[in-house]
């Protein structure tokens, strides 16, 4: 038999029309169109020709082999149409024997790719031969191969047909949640009489929703379909069958609400009282601020309050809840646990996802902004959960809805009536407003007024009159008057008042010495800024702030200066050399000793810094020491943040340290599994530090919490705390107009005083007595029988305790003494000249050269001193220094 195709005149390629029916081509083109040899074995003979490509095959070379010649059109395995458009390649493996991919007579292995299809759920992922993928998605395959090891698959080949979800899906990067039905959001009738259901999957965006058939073998789908049908049925009869309210809103809950008892859930007594107060306020039409201290469950109280309105027939919504993006997941969990019958829609995601929500989740009927404005829409959902950003971005749509209630979590976003969030949200149509904040009086009286103005613009509409009425809130009559105004609108309780059985906390200031390297840098920062410091009449405030910021960096670690980091010794692993890294900073040296003991005693640590670059240095340190850790800062968003929290809180977690930036670590984070808090550098704003240690000292904590605040001895850090704390304690209530905000309230004299603090000892030739932490000192420091002043509330809470309204009495002030000297450290106008000018007499040439070389050595690390540049106002990046002070401290 001839090796050429068609040698046998009686054998014709099945399914092919005669050659004369093919498009006529010249011989040269025909050569490239039809192959002459089997695609598999490269031999000739009786060959089967594909109707879709030029390839030809022996029947026996196909896998599985063809027993007979197929009738009609036939296409080879390579050309079999794909089930859909490939979205991405998840993994690859060597083809198994049962594959329909081609085998070679030489036994060569063929690859298969695990494909996620566009518009289809992960349940429909399947293995596709490499040949098919190369034909239809060559660029996708090439991209996958570039970033993957294609020599051997990362996972062992196993049988995936046994129904084992791990072997079929999880091992290839598919999360279990992506296979769980969250809810059915719509349906569509098929022409053949069947029904398709649009399914929203857990932890996936709405644009990942997919159409599924009821007959599909997907766990939980039938139950979700039943709930969907029940919701549609109840929605249709909602207006005509609305039941009368079962419980009077003015009646206070004396026990757990019935719907919580039935679910086996239980509130604390103070939370029951909070829910009752919210219900009463709703009934009276009084907008409110729930200002409980952080960690007392404002989220849960709010959810139960809304659920009580729903369950008792007072209101079915719609309720709008606006929260930080980082807390969305936590709100979803609490709503699902405490209010399972509320239909909650999380309105986040890209344009496509939000379009899906608007189309399928707003109503069972077709909706338009016109019908919503005219209040003709029967809403499908009860609660819409969204972030601040989408309140503004989609105001044209969301602003058309008549909201029964608005809840704003972390309501300090409304402290300025000039903010976009404030202005846009004020235009929404809202029946009742509830603001949640743990720090209602964070800065000044003006910010409090703006919160009240947002709640009730008709009642609180004149800022000047409000400020004039409360010019001095330290006076008893003005405090009393302020209480009368706030009483209907605000409720605040403290942990010390309502959680008597909660483990105590002890906070300590830990004074730390500068290392020799830090002292050299500290001196250089001062000397290179001699001209700015020595200006008669005082330097510019902005210049002094810049100097202070450089000194604060120096107090943390010299490696925060780029040139110093570049000169640092790097280990083969790419990390800083550990000994040099640790010894360069007095704080890090002490931290190293503390962590060793804390790890040995099975404690877990939250480590805060307000500088994200310092967190980078701490990461190098933790990796070098071999400690497992998690990290959250402002760049880590959404579900990644929640995953880190869940990972750390896992009962079997090996993670020892949680790194947090002070600002990012204060919102919606529960880390009560940690019992030690170390504040590496204090924030300007004391509320942020209070929020920081409240991550651990909150409901759910079972151990005493130890809080250590590092402060560099005889430095700007120490003086800032003394000056700021004294100013805040003098005012008692930080609500005086003009205080706080983003501009500093430190005068030039105070700034100069802060910069001078400790410099005499620094520039002395002799050695002063230094604080040293040996093993015994560290053990004493970590002794958990030590007591701070936890029986006192922090000053930050003392001033807020004056605003405990409803039936909550004001606590008496605690007398407190500190080392602050009311007089400036040194008011000599020639101070810097005397310190640095006269202390550097004219030197002989040889000594002068050595001195200059020494200066060059420092400059090679830090830079060549002050250059002409635009002044940078660091007060735009850091809160005002006048707000920085520790709470409940013991000086070590």
Curated annotation (Swiss-Prot):
Residues 279-458 form the Helicase ATP-binding domain. Residues 1-20 have a biased composition (Basic and acidic residues). Keywords: Activator, ATP-binding, Chromosome, DNA-binding, Hydrolase, Metal-binding, Nucleotide-binding, Nucleus, Repeat, Transcription, Transcription regulation, Zinc, Zinc-finger. Its main location: nucleus. A zinc finger (PHD-type) spans 35-82. ATP binds at residues 292-299. A motif (DEAH box) lies at residues 409-412. This is Chromodomain-helicase-DNA-binding protein 3. It comes from Drosophila melanogaster (Fruit fly).
């Amino acid at each position: 038999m001839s090796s050429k195709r068609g040698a046998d005149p009686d054998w014709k390629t099945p399914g092919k029309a005669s050659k004369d029916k093919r498009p006529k081509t010249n011989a040269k083109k025909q050569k490239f169109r039809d192959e002459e040899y089997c695609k598999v074995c490269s031999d000739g003979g009786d060959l089967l020709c594909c109707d879709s490509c030029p390839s030809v095959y022996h029947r026996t070379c196909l896998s599985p082999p063809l027993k007979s010649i197929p009738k009609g059109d036939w296409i080879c395995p390579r050309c079999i149409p794909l089930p859909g458009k490939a979205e991405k390649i998840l993994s690859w493996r060597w083809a198994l024997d049962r594959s329909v991919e081609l085998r070679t007579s030489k036994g060569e292995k063929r690859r298969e790719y695990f494909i996620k299809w566009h518009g289809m759920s992960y349940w429909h992922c399947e293995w596709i031969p490499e040949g098919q993928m190369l034909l239809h998605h060559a660029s996708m395959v090439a991209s996958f191969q570039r970033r993957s090891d294609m020599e051997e698959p990362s996972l062992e080949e196993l049988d995936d047909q046994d129904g084992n979800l791990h072997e079929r899906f999880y091992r290839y990067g598919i999360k279990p949640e992506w296979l769980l039905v969250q809810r059915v959001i719509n349906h569509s009738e098929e022409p053949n009489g069947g029904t398709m259901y649009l399914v929203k999957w857990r932890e996936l965006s709405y644009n990942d929703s997919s159409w599924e058939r009821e007959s599909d073998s997907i766990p939980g789908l039938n139950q979700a379909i039943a709930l969907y049908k029940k919701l549609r049925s109840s929605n249709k009869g909602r207006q005509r069958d609305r039941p009368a309210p079962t419980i009077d809103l003015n009646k206070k809950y004396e026990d757990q609400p019935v719907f919580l008892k039935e679910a086996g859930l239980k509130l604390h007594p103070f939370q029951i009282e909070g829910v009752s107060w919210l219900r009463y306020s709703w009934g009276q039409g009084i907008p409110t601020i729930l200002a409980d201290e952080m960690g007392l469950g404002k989220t849960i109280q709010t959810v139960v309050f809304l659920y009580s309105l729903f369950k008792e027939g007072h209101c079915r919504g719609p309720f709008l809840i606006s929260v930080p993006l980082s807390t969305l997941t936590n709100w979803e969990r609490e709503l699902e646990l405490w209010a399972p019958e509320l239909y909650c829609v999380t309105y986040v995601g890209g344009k496509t996802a939000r379009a899906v929500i608007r189309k399928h989740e707003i109503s069972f009927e077709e909706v338009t902004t016109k019908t919503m404005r005219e209040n003709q829409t029967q809403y499908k959902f009860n609660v819409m959960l969204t972030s601040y950003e989408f309140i503004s971005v989609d105001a044209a749509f969301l602003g058309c809805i008549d909201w029964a209630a608005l809840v704003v979590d972390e309501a300090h976003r409304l402290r300025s009536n000039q903010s976009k969030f404030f202005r846009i949200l004020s235009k929404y149509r809202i029946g009742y407003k509830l603001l949640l904040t743990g720090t209602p009086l964070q800065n000044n009286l003006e910010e409090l007024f703006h919160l009240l103005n947002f709640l009730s613009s008709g009642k609180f509409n004149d800022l000047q009159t409000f400020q004039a009425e409360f010019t001095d809130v330290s006076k008893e009559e003005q405090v009393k008057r302020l209480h009368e105004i706030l009483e209907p609108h605000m409720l605040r309780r403290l942990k010390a008042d309502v959680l008597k059985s909660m483990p105590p906390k002890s906070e300590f200031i830990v004074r730390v010495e500068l290392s020799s390297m830090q002292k050299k840098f500290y001196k250089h920062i001062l000397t290179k800024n001699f001209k700015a410091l020595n200006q008669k009449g005082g330097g510019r405030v902005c210049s002094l702030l810049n100097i202070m910021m450089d000194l604060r960096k120096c107090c943390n670690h010299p490696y925060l200066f780029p040139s110093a980091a570049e000169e640092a010794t790097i280990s083969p692993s790419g990390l800083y050399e550990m000994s040099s890294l640790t010894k360069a900073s007095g704080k890090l040296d002490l931290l190293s000793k503390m962590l060793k003991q804390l790890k040995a005693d099975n404690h877990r640590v939250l480590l805060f810094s307000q500088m994200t670059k310092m967190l980078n240095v701490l990461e190098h340190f933790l990796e070098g020491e071999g400690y497992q850790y998690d990290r959250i800062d402002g760049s880590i968003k959404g579900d990644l943040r929640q995953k880190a929290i869940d990972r750390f809180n896992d009962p079997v977690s090996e993670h020892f340290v949680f790194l947090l930036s002070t600002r990012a670590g204060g919102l919606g984070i529960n880390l009560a599994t940690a019992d030690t808090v170390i504040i590496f550098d204090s924030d300007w704003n004391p509320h942020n530090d209070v929020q920081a240690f409240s991550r651990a000292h909150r409901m759910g904590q079972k151990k005493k919490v130890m809080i250590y605040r590092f402060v560099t001895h005889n430095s700007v850090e120490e003086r800032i705390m003394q000056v700021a704390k004294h100013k805040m304690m003098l005012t008692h209530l930080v609500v005086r107009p003009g205080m706080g905000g983003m501009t500093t309230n430190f005068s030039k004299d105070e700034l100069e005083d802060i910069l001078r603090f400790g410099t005499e000892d620094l520039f002395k030739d002799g050695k002063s007595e230094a604080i040293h932490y040996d093993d015994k000192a560290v053990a004493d420091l970590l002794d958990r029988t030590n007591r701070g002043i936890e029986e006192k509330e922090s000053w930050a809470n003392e001033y807020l305790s004056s605003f405990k309204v409803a039936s909550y009495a004001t606590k008496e002030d605690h007398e407190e003494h500190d080392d602050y000297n009311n007089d400036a450290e040194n008011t000599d106008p020639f101070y810097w000249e005397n310190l640095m000018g006269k202390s550097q007499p004219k030197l002989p040439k040889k000594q002068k050269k050595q001195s200059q070389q020494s200066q060059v050595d420092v400059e090679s690390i830090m830079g060549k001193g002050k250059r002409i540049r635009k002044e940078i106002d660091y007060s735009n990046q850091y809160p005002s220094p006048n707000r920085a002070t520790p709470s409940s401290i013991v000086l070590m």
